[in-house]
C-alpha cells in the first residue's frame, strides 16, 4: 500500500515534489509512538539488566587488579558521599526537563486558543497563586522548532535516544571488563538472585540493582546528558537563556560528583556524554516523530494505539517548514498564496 504525498516548500511557489510513500514509511500516530516506545525502552532496560549480570560476573578481581590510572581521578580528592549528589542533580535535571516540556505543552494549547488548564483555583489565598505557578503560560516569542505537537515529539526524542544508547551500552559493558574504581566495588557483592536483580534494574533503571563492572560507559552520564540537551533545545520557547544557564551549571557539577565519588573513570563520562548527545541530534525533531526505521521496531506491536493516522489521506498535503536559525521568531510561516 502506498500513499500519494504532495509537499509544498514554504516561501516558494512550486511543489518540491511528489512521491509514493510505502506502507512501512508511513508515520504512526504520535500518541502511538509515545506509548510503544515506552514499552521498547522498558525492554531495553531489561536487556541492560541481563548485561549487568554478565559485567558483574566478569569484572576483574579487585584484589588482583588495581584501578586504572586516571588523570582526573588522581587530581580530584575522593568524597564518597558525593555519589548522592549525583542522584540529586539527576532529579533536578529531569525535573527541569519535565517542567520545560509541560510548559511548552501549555504554550501550544494557548496558541491554539484552547482554554487554560486550572486546578483547585477556588482554594482561598493560595489557589490562584498555585495555578499561576503550575499552569501559567510562558512565551519568549522564540520558536526553535515548530510548535505543533512539540510535547509528544519531545517525548519521542527522549524515549528513542535513551533506548538506542541503552542497547549500545549493554553490548559495551559485556564486551570489555574494566577493573573497579576505588569505590564500594572494591568489595563486590555476589548476585545471588539474578532474576530479582534484573527486575530491580527495570524498576529503578539500574540504580537499585547490584551493578559493579558496568563502567564503560556511564549510565548516570547518559541520563544527565539527555536531560541537559532536551532542556537546552526546548527551553527557548519559554525564556531565551535562563534555563540554559541553570542546566549548564548543573551538568559539570554532576560530572564532578561522579568523579569525586569514584563511580566512574573519566573516559566513561566523556564517551557517554558524546554518544548520548550525538544520538539525540541524529534523531531530529520531526513532525512525523521518530525516523521511519525506528518506527519499524514498534509497528508490529498490536497494542497500544493504532497503526494509522485517521486524517492521513491519499492527497494529504505535507508542509515543509524551513527553520534556518535556532532562535527564529517565527518557525511556522503561513503558506504563500498561489
Swiss-Prot record:
Cellular component terms (Gene Ontology): ciliary pocket; endoplasmic reticulum membrane; endosome; Golgi apparatus; Golgi membrane; plasma membrane
Gene: IPCS
Record keyword Ligase present: no
Keyword flag Nucleotidyltransferase: no
EC number assigned by the record: 2.7.8.-
Protein name: Phosphatidylinositol:ceramide inositolphosphotransferase
UniProt subcellular location: Membrane
Ranges of the Cytoplasmic topological domain: 1-36, 109-116, 174-189, 244-338
Keyword annotations from UniProtKB, A to Z: Kinase, Lipid metabolism, Membrane, Sphingolipid metabolism, Transferase, Transmembrane, Transmembrane helix
Residues at the catalytic site: 220, 264, 268
Function of the molecule: Bidirectional lipid inositolphosphotransferase capable of converting phosphatidylinositol (PI) and ceramide to inositol-phosphorylceramide (IPC) and diacylglycerol (DAG) and vice versa. Direction is dependent on the relative concentrations of DAG and ceramide as phosphoinositol acceptors. Essential for viability of the pathogenic bloodstream stage of this human protozoan parasite and, consequently, can be considered as potential drug target.
EC top class, as a word: transferase
Biological process according to GO: ceramide biosynthetic process; ethanolamine biosynthetic process
Membrane side Extracellular: residue ranges: 58-87, 138-152, 211-222
UniProt main location, coarse: membrane
Pfam families in the cross-refs: PAP2_C
Organism whose genome encodes this protein: Leishmania major
InterPro entries: Sphingomyelin_synth-like, Sphingomyelin_synth-like_dom
Membrane topology: Multi-pass membrane protein
Transmembrane segments: 37-57, 88-108, 117-137, 153-173, 190-210, 223-243
A GO MF term: kinase activity
Family: Belongs to the sphingomyelin synthase family.
Amino acid at each position: 500500500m502506498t500513499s500519494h504525498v504532495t509537499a509544498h516548500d514554504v516561501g516558494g511557489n512550486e511543489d518540491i515534489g511528489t512521491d509514493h510513500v510505502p506502507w512501512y514509511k508511513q508515520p504512526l500516530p504520535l500518541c502511538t509512538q509515545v506509548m510503544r516506545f515506552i514499552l521498547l525502552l522498558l525492554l531495553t532496560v531489561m536487556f541492560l539488566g541481563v548485561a549487568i549480570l554478565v559485567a558483574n560476573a566478569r569484572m576483574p578481581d579487585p584484589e588482583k587488579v588495581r584501578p586504572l590510572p586516571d588523570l582526573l581521578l588522581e587530581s580530584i580528592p575522593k568524597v564518597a558521599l558525593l555519589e548522592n549528589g549525583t542522584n540529586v542533580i539527576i532529579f533536578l535535571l529531569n525535573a527541569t526537563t519535565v517542567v520545560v516540556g509541560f510548559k511548552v505543552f501549555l504554550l501550544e494549547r494557548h496558541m491554539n486558543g484552547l482554554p487554560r488548564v486550572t486546578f483547585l483555583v477556588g482554594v482561598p489565598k493560595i489557589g490562584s497563586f498555585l495555578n499561576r505557578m503550575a499552569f501559567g503560560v510562558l512565551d519568549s516569542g522564540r520558536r526553535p522548532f515548530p510548535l505543533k505537537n512539540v510535547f509528544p515529539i519531545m517525548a519521542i526524542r527522549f524515549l528513542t535516544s535513551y533506548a538506542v544508547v541503552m542497547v549500545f551500552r549493554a553490548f559495551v559493558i559485556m564486551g570489555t571488563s574494566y577493573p573497579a574504581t576505588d569505590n564500594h566495588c572494591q568489595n563486590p557483592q555476589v548476585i545471588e538472585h539474578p532474576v530479582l536483580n534484573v527486575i530491580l534494574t527495570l524498576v529503578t533503571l539500574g540504580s537499585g540493582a547490584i551493578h559493579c563492572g558496568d563502567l564503560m560507559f556511564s549510565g548516570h552520564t547518559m541520563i544527565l546528558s539527555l536531560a541537559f540537551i532536551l532542556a537546552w533545545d526546548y527551553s527557548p520557547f519559554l525564556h531565551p537563556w535562563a534555563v540554559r544557564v541553570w542546566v549548564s551549571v548543573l551538568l559539570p557539577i554532576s560530572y564532578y560528583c561522579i568523579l569525586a565519588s569514584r563511580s566512574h573513570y573519566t573516559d566513561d563520562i566523556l564517551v557517554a556524554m558524546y554518544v548520548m548527545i550525538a544520538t539525540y541530534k541524529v534523531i531530529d525533531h520531526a513532525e512525523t516523530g521518530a525516523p521511519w526505521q525506528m518506527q519499524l521496531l514498534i509497528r508490529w506491536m498490536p497494542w497500544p494505539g493504532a497503526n494509522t493516522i485517521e486524517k492521513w489521506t491519499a492527497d494529504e498535503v505535507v508542509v515543509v517548514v524551513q527553520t534556518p536559525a535556532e532562535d527564529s521568531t517565527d518557525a511556522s510561516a503561513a503558506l504563500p498564496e498561489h
